[in-house]
C-alpha cells in the first residue's frame, strides 16, 4: 500500500519564510521592561508553497536542493520501518529518475504544535512514473495523503519528518502486490579477497544514531494512547492529548482537529482486542517537543478489515505540558 515512499519523497524547502523576532526597542522612559516580538506564524499556503518547490526538486533528482532545507534531525520511515536520516535521504534523492506529466497538490491543512513547530498535511495527485527499487519505471501511486513536520531554524523553516499514505477506501482496499521472487545468492569471495577488498563493507561505518533519554517515557505514553483507543476511552484520550492535535491514519484519512481525532478514535470504526508499541526511538526537536518513531500492532478489525498481526510504523510528536508529555501529531503507515 505504501510503495510511494521509495520514489516520492515530498519533503521540505529551504525558502526563507518567517523570522524569529528580536527584542523590540524600549523607548519609553518610564518602561523598564524589554519586550520581544512574538515569532511570526506561517500559513498553510506558505508551507504548501515550500512543499511544492520540494516536489519539483525531487522529481528532477536535485539532491543538492535538499541539503539545506532538511533539518539535521530529519527522518523518514521506509515501509519496513527503517529510519532514514538526512544523509541517507539526500543520497536516495540523487538516484531518482521520474517522468511526471502532472502533479496536483490540494487540501493543505496546518496544525500548530508549538510556536516553532508545525504539521502540514495535503493531498497529492500524480500522473507519471518514477524509478522503483529495481531501477525500472513504476507508476506513481495516487492519490496520497502527505504530511510534513516543519521547524523554525533561525530565519528559515526546515523539515524534520515527511510521510505519505495511499488514500484508500477502508472497505475496499487495493489488492496486495505479488511477492517478489527470492534473490539468488551470489558466490562468496574467498577470505583473502574479502580481506583485501577495498569496499564499503571494509570502511568505517558512520556513527549510529541513538535515542534520547525520554524514549522509554514516550513509549509508555504512546502505549497508553493506543490502549485508550482500543477501549474507546474518551476521558483517557482527552488527558493524553495536547491542545491542538492532527493525525493521518493508515487509510490516508486526515483528522484535522482534536475533536475529529476524539470522535474517530472513540467511534465504532475499530474493534480491537489487543495492542502493542515497541521499537521506540525519540529525538528532541526542542526542550519541549519530542519526535517518537515507533512500531505498533493491533489485533482486531478496523473499517471492516482484519488488522490482526498488521505491523504499523509511525511517528508521533509530543509536547511538554508541565511534567507530562502530550500527543500533538501522529501518522500511522502500514508496513510494506
Where are the language model's segments positioned?
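A beta-strand edge to alpha-helix "cap/lid" segment located at domain peripheries
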Residues: 21-68, 75-236, 246-336
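C-terminal motif of bacterial Sec signal peptides marking the signal peptidase cleavage site
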Residues: 16-19
Amino acid at each position: 500500500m505504501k510503495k510511494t515512499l521509495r520514489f516520492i519523497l515530498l519533503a521540505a524547502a529551504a525558502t526563507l519564510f518567517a523570522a524569529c523576532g528580536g527584542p523590540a526597542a524600549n523607548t519609553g522612559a518610564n518602561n523598564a521592561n524589554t519586550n520581544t516580538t512574538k515569532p511570526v506564524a506561517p500559513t498553510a499556503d506558505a508551507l504548501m508553497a515550500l512543499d511544492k518547490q520540494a516536489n519539483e526538486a525531487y522529481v528532477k533528482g536535485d539532491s543538492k536542493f535538499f541539503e539545506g532545507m532538511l533539518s539535521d534531525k530529519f527522518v523518514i520511515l521506509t515501509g519496513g520501518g527503517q529510519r532514514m536520516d538526512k544523509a541517507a535521504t539526500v543520497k536516495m534523492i540523487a538516484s531518482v529518475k521520474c517522468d511526471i506529466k502532472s502533479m496536483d497538490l490540494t487540501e493543505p491543512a496546518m496544525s500548530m504544535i508549538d510556536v516553532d513547530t508545525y504539521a502540514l498535511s495535503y493531498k497529492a495527485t500524480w500522473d507519471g512514473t518514477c524509478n522503483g527499487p529495481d531501477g525500472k519505471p513504476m507508476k506513481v501511486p495516487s492519490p496520497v495523503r502527505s504530511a510534513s513536520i516543519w521547524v523554525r531554524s533561525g530565519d528559515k523553516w526546515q523539515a524534520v519528518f515527511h510521510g505519505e499514505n495511499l488514500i484508500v477506501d477502508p472497505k475496499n482496499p487495493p489488492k496486495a502486490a505479488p511477492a517478489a521472487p527470492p534473490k539468488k545468492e551470489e558466490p562468496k569471495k574467498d577470505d583473502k579477497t574479502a580481506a583485501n577488498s577495498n569496499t564499503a563493507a571494509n570502511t568505517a561505518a558512520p556513527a549510529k544514531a541513538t535515542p534520547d533519554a525520554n524514549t522509554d517515557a514516550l513509549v509508555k505514553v504512546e502505549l497508553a494512547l493506543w490502549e485508550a483507543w482500543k477501549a474507546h476511552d474518551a476521558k483517557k484520550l482527552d488527558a493524553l492529548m495536547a491542545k491542538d492535535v492532527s493525525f493521518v491514519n493508515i487509510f490516508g484519512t486526515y483528522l484535522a482537529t482534536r475533536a475529529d481525532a476524539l470522535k474517530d478514535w472513540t467511534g465504532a470504526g475499530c474493534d480491537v482486542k489487543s495492542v502493542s508499541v515497541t521499537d521506540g526511538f525519540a529525538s528532541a526537536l526542542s526542550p519541549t517537543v519530542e519526535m517518537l518513531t515507533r512500531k505498533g500492532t493491533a489485533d482486531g478489525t478496523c473499517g471492516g478489515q482484519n488488522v490482526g498481526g498488521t505491523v504499523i510504523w509511525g511517528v508521533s510528536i509530543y509536547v511538554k505540558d508541565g511534567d507530562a508529555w502530550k500527543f500533538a501529531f501522529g501518522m500511522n503507515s502500514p508496513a510494506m
